[in-house]
């Protein structure tokens, strides 16, 4: 089975003219030191930051403004990634480098292909599209963050709330309940949803057009035979000419323009509302928040509130204001068109009325016909008939797409067979029960923990130290289930300081034993912990990175490492290039 493994991490701070590099071996790695404030957590956070995740750094580290390079492998293939702020430079051969201006979009797609991560999430907004989520959603089950994860699994990184309701599909994908085929079908469902929405918008426009026709030409109860109309037409055809056709065209054009104006006015209301909301966001960030972090009161996500972030808000506001201005200009153009069409329509109708006065008469059956009414009726019926046909067509399309969506959702449900679901459930409950027992966390009530989505039910029973061990049992179970499910290429398991809540000596020994004996043989493990005698069995098998009082960055070595990163940056080609090989 293929695995992703970290090889080398390089940190460079031009601010302090200091740098360092760290190498990892394929199986066990230990990051340790004599005390708790030497940078163990910052080191592992930078691994994930380099790959586009957003771990929570303290202000001291942020002030260093580091560039971070990471070398990693998937099976036998080497990859290099360099992150500077939010820009990613990437290579799959160590020679040709390609620069991505942002983490979302192309880079996320490239990375997801490398690790075979097929989960997709709908974007927020009125017109959601199915997107490849950033690498953070892939790495979530592989990183136990010291501050965020021991009491809240699936919460190792910031900014995860960029997608609504992401947890269920992501957790289920990692643990095998949703397959890559599920998301392939989901893409088709979203395509049909977009077609349904477009059809609905067309129906709304058609209804508006019909209302406009009825406004200009009220409904008539006039009934006239073809023979009667031919008699009248023959008498007046030289003078009536193309007036009926002209009125029909003018009326159709006017209804189209009025309908478009109506919908643009709705869009204008939305755009104005967006400007106001963005202005309120900026005022709040400036007037009420004193630091560079802002925690969401609803989901707990910590958002960036730095000067750069505030500048981004102002940029968003400018874009929204530009959109308001553009829509207003479009409406003004439509108003001009309406002002031009209305006199033309009135002129045509006035000419028809003149002909009506000239030829108003009764036929031999004493039936009296008003030519204006006849021409109006035929024009109105023609326009309404055309739009009604389109309306019926769009409604049929909407129903067809809804039916296809139902078929696809049924196909999705059938992907997870009863036996497969039972097998996944048995694997999960059996393993977490075994691990909780091995970790001596028997005070934790597992009776309601039947599924990987039940992680919150781990907490609340047993003591705080037992809760920490139960959290590790859960994370280890998920890690093993990822291998069992085989939906993706697994990443290394990174555990930041498992000695939470002052674990008793024998329980800490059990934690180390579980990590050594119950992680898959082909997996890579990176463990952070204070140096002590109980780490002995792990140290015997591990590559040890021992941090000293100089912490992560040193003055010596800066020139060499800085030059290495500069050469990569200078050689990188701007933008995504299809030359990147994703098939190896």
Describe the role of every protein-language-model region:
Residues 86-183, 187-190:
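Extended, charged alpha-helical "arm/stalk" segments used for dimerization and assembly
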């Amino acid at each position: 089975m293929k695995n992703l493994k970290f090889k080398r991490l390089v940190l460079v701070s031009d601010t302090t003219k200091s740098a360092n590099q760290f190498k990892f071996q394929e199986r066990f790695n230990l990051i340790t030191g004599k005390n708790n404030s030497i940078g163990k957590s910052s080191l592992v956070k930078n691994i994930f930051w380099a790959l586009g995740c957003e771990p929570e750094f303290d202000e001291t580290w942020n002030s260093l403004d580091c560039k971070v390079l990471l070398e990693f492998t998937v099976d036998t293939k080497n990859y290099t990634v360099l992150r500077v702020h939010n820009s990613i430079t990437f290579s799959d051969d160590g020679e040709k480098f390609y620069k991505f201006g942002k983490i979302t979009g192309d880079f996320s797609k490239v990375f997801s292909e490398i690790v075979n991560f097929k989960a997709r999430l709908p974007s927020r907004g009125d017109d959601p599209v199915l997107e490849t989520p950033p690498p953070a959603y892939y790495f979530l089950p592989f990183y136990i963050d010291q501050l965020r994860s021991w009491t809240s699994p699936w919460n190792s990184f910031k900014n995860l709330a960029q997608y609504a309701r992401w947890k269920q599909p992501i957790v289920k994908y990692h643990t095998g309940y949703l397959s890559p085929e599920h998301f392939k079908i989901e893409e088709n469902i979203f395509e049909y949803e977009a077609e349904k929405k477009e059809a609905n918008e067309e129906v709304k426009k058609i209804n508006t057009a019909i209302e406009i026709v009825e406004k200009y030409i009220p409904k008539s109860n006039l009934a006239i035979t073809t023979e009667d109309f031919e008699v009248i037409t023959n008498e007046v055809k030289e003078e009536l000419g193309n007036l009926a056709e002209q009125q029909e065209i003018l009326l159709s054009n006017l209804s189209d323009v009025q309908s478009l104006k109506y919908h643009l006015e709705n869009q204008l209301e939305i755009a104005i509302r967006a400007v106001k909301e963005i202005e309120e966001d900026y005022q709040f960030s400036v007037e009420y928040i004193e630091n560079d972090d802002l925690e969401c009161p609803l989901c707990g996500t910590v958002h960036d509130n730095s000067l750069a972030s505030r500048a981004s808000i102002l940029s968003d506001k400018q874009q929204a204001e530009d959109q308001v201005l553009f829509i207003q200009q479009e409406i003004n153009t439509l108003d001009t068109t309406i002002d031009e069409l209305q006199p033309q329509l009135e002129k045509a109708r006035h000419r028809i009325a003149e002909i009506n006065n000239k030829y108003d008469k009764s036929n031999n059956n004493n039936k009296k016909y008003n030519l204006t009414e006849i021409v109006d009726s035929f024009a109105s019926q023609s326009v309404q008939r055309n739009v009604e046909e389109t309306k019926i067509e769009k409604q049929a399309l909407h129903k067809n797409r809804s039916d296809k969506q139902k078929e696809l959702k049924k196909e999705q449900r059938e992907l997870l067979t009863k036996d497969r679901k039972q097998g996944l459930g048995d694997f999960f409950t059996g393993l977490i029960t075994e691990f909780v027992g091995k970790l001596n966390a028997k005070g934790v009530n597992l009776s309601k923990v039947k599924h990987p989505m039940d992680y919150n039910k781990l907490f609340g029973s047993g003591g705080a130290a037992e809760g920490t061990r139960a959290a590790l049992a859960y994370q280890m179970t998920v890690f093993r289930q990822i291998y069992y499910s085989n939906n993706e290429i697994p990443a290394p398991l990174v555990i930041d300081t498992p000695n939470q809540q002052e674990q008793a000596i024998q329980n800490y020994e059990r934690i180390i034993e579980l990590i050594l004996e119950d992680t898959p043989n082909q997996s890579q493990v990176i463990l952070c912990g204070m140096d002590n005698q109980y780490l002995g069995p792990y140290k015997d098998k591990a590559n040890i990175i021992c941090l000293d009082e100089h912490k992560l960055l040193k003055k010596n070595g800066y020139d060499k490492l800085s030059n290495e990163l500069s050469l990569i940056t200078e050689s990188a080609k701007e933008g995504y290039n299809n030359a990147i090989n994703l098939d190896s």
